[in-house]
Amino acid sequence: MLVAGLFASGCGGGDAPSKAEFGASADKVCKDAEHALTGIQKPKSAADAAQAVDKVIDATQGSLDDLKDLDRPDGAAGDAADKFIASQESEIQKGIPALEKLRDALKSKDQQAMVKAEAELRAIDTTDTNALARAAGAKGCAD
């Protein structure tokens, strides 16, 4: 599903996209990822919750891969796009290990580990990435 959005937004001639075109493509990736995440069913058990966390990990990694595959604008707009994607990748590289810890804690029903993993997730500061998304024209990826 996310891959289809990538092909719809990024193929064509050899010209670099404009800032607005990059922003629209990035926003589509973010919207598709949000849609995938909201489609995950509310878990009814710890085992269901662990499976849901795996789906979150997969969707998150997939959206990052799709963002990284987008063509960037030239010049300052391209630099802004690169900074946004690098910041997003940094956040995700912090988040996935915390999600894996949460999944493992859910599987083992370790309440203390769950609380610790949730705290790690909440501690990830998205302020810079949100500002960089807006600067890159990807306002839909902010917040």
Locate the predicted segments by residue.
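C-terminal motif of bacterial Sec signal peptides marking the signal peptidase cleavage site
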Residues: 7-10
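Bacterial signal peptide processing site
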Residues: 12-14
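Sec-dependent N-terminal signal peptides
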Residues: 1-3
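Alpha-helical segments in soluble extracytoplasmic regions
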Residues: 21-108, 112-141
